[in-house]
């Protein structure tokens, strides 16, 4: 992994009681040792694999103003991180779920792009077995379950300030207003809606195949083509490129897919991040509720699976062997 750390700072927030968070600030930057580089590489890998929301700084963002000064050389990175941690403590103190943690600021470069990663990591306790096979207590940073994370694409922010995607962050778990306080701390608002872009793409594909008057098999083949392209982009960590996708679909219609989306006003960006859960709808139908979970390949609709919209009834012809075996045993009174 071609990752180079420019500067990295570490501080701590300790929850003493329900209303107070103690601030513990380092007096020096961390040295980019092999261990530190491995930790940041793991953070980068875990964060890059997660679905993210996209945003941009508000005009009055204190963090953006301080970061701009730091980038211009008017403040050093350590001072920037110490002041920002203080602002983070003030925001966290407003919320009852505030737990504290290890606050990390890392300016690094990956594949010619500069990033600033900001995260609050939990420092957890566990056990380890030493070389004498004795069990001893140990502590570790819970990187895999980090949910208070934001990353600023410094290259994009500085070269294209009108962008709506240079800042990314993780949505908080259900029931926690993590995104709320972190957005307040960042002084940011949501920008590009990746899910909406992906939903728009799916609708455009359906309309494109309908206008081309394709039969059912041909429509499904196009959907599979779109899914294959988008999934390859997702696996490679690349965005969906509308023009590239249009080339993949050349021959489907006299009008190219990119021309079709522009003429019909789908408002799709030239490129946008792939959303795994939305793209899955290209090849599968899935849903759950009321104790029922259903998931099946789209090609089966109208062949083995039939839906009557008038009665909202789904009819399945031919059940999976393992399901059929369970049904037979239960209905015959067996266990």
UniProtKB/Swiss-Prot annotation:
InterPro entries for this protein: Nucleoid_associated_NdpA
A GO molecular-function descriptor: single-stranded RNA binding
Recorded GO CC terms: bacterial nucleoid; cytoplasm
Chief localisation class: cytoplasm
Residues spanning the membrane: none
Subcellular location: Cytoplasm, Nucleoid
Key words, A-Z: Cytoplasm
Disulfide bond residue pairs: none
Family as reported in the entry's similarity comment: Belongs to the YejK family.
Full protein name: Nucleoid-associated protein YejK
Organism: Salmonella typhimurium (strain LT2 / SGSC1412 / ATCC 700720)
């Amino acid at each position: 992994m071609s990752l180079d750390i420019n500067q990295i700072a570490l501080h701590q927030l300790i929850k003493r009681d329900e209303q107070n968070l103690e601030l513990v600030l380092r007096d020096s930057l961390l040295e980019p040792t092999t261990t530190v580089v491995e930790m940041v590489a793991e953070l980068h890998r875990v964060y890059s694999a997660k679905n993210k929301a996209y945003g941009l700084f508000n005009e009055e963002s204190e963090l953006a103003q301080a970061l701009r000064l730091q980038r211009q050389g008017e403040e050093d990175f350590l001072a920037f991180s110490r002041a920002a941690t203080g602002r983070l403590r003030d925001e966290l103190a407003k919320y009852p779920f505030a737990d504290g943690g290890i606050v990390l600021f890392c300016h690094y470069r990956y594949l010619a792009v500069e990033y600033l990663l900001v995260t609050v990591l939990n420092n957890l306790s566990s056990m380890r077995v030493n070389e004498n096979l004795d069990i001893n207590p140990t502590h570790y940073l819970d990187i895999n379950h980090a949910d208070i994370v934001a990353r600023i694409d410094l290259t994009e922010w500085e070269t294209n300030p009108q962008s709506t995607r240079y800042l990314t962050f993780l949505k908080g778990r259900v029931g926690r207003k993590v995104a709320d306080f972190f957005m307040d701390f960042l002084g940011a608002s949501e920008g590009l809606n990746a899910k909406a872009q992906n939903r728009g793409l799916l609708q455009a594909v359906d309309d494109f195949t309908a206008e081309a008057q394709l039969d059912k098999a041909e429509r499904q083949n196009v959907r599979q083509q779109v899914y294959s392209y988008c999934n390859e982009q997702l696996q490679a960590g690349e965005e969906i490129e509308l023009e590239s996708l249009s080339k993949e679909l050349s021959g489907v219609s006299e009008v190219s897919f990119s021309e079709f989306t522009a003429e019909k006003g789908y408002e799709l960006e030239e490129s946008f991040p792939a959303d795994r859960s939305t793209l899955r709808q290209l090849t599968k139908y899935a849903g759950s509720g009321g104790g029922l979970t259903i998931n099946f390949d789209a090609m089966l609709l109208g062949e083995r699976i039939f839906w009557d919209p008038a009665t909202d009834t789904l009819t399945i012809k031919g059940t999976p062997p393992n399901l059929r075996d369970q049904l037979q045993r239960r209905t015959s009174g067996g266990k």
